[in-house]
């Protein structure tokens, strides 16, 4: 074949590719054009900048609550994106036909680059094998064995904060302390490794990397959607070189953060592998005494059949995945709880009295701690009203029909009881919309009211359940790809609150707090700061003396 024809052939191929893209775009737009939603802000980026903007919380709430259980926003070049909070539709997407509705290419590419081939970045048979190996170590039975580890960490946190407020109430960045606490809890309970002595100010290398990850990713949010098209470009060394010399500093920052996380995970894995090879005595001398998740996981993997065993690369990736998933989400939720308790001092005092009456500060058995009603209500209500993660998506691998539990009225007045969804359409999972719909939760659904969990939930919730794995909520998602560690997170929050509220009071400062949109929502002082923090006025609680 003559090389003279190559430019012509490339031009034809490019034209065909553009034509196919435009045809697909027209097809999806014509099918979904009748779904209600806000107008595009831009012909090029649609509503993406509004949705993913750092201050996009109001826009997300508007889409979640003002356009019905199914809405439409616009992506690149006007391509429609569905927002789905309808219970029947969610059941179809996440459970009944989960093999049809896959995570987006952007999600898989991003999580692979961040954490490696772990649970978040895999699908199909590889994901099934990983999940099968992981399920036992996240069971309630195993959580019970980890409770002493949790209390041990929290007593160190208690002593450290006590030193800082012994002379009177002080302003303390509780997001930082919750981040250090969550990292140490997953370190000891998950990896059998101590990251932080929790005495000195400051944090360690891994903690700093995690703290800066979400703000850094947020600043390249729209750019991240292009990753599926470039992340396999050339060999790995070439991609790393491109990132190193990329003109945007945030991209280089993200690379350095990922490098730090991967290096730390590899070092921890290597030390655990040596201890396991030496035998039980060496393992018992490690933090967690061999009861941590990774020690049990590595032992189980070594004894698994060849068909079920996973390679070391995937085990290391699980460590990075655990550390990320169990640190930012839980620490930011705990910071949100403390802020809400500062806003609602009566609830704070009632919760404190419940905890003190149960003697939950020093140690409490798993089932007893889990049964404290107001503590449970505070955790559930915060997870309902303020889900930390709201930007999860699926994409159908074929044209499909999405059934609805209630009809949607189209922009032309047509009543739709099902929706034809073209292959490749991005579907945003309506976590916030599902958790807060007035039709399910009542007129006060937007309000933070922990006491709603102290009595039976309304029939509109119990008789029309969503498929979420946790408490009629979508916060931890549903189906085979639901959050595997939600019980770990719930127990962590309850132990933290039991110890902190037994010893300290929390009040607001005069600094304005802004919660920002990112992969995991995070707080800053004001809307312009890039530093994730939540300052609260912390004082010692004076326990009543017994007469």
UniProtKB/Swiss-Prot annotation:
Gene3D superfamilies: Cytochrome P450 (1.10.630.10)
Glycosylated residues, chain numbering: 503, 516
Domain of life of the source: Eukaryota
EC top class named in words: oxidoreductase
EC code: 1.-.-.-
Keywords, in A-Z order: Glycoprotein, Heme, Iron, Membrane, Metal-binding, Monooxygenase, Oxidoreductase, Transmembrane, Transmembrane helix
Function text: Cytochrome P450 monooxygenase that is able to use dehydroabietic acid as a substrate for oxidation.
Listed PANTHER family: CYTOCHROME P450 (PTHR24305), CYTOCHROME P450 12A4, MITOCHONDRIAL-RELATED (PTHR24305:SF166)
Listed name of the protein: Cytochrome P450 monooxygenase 81
Record organism: Postia placenta (strain ATCC 44394 / Madison 698-R)
Gene: CYP081
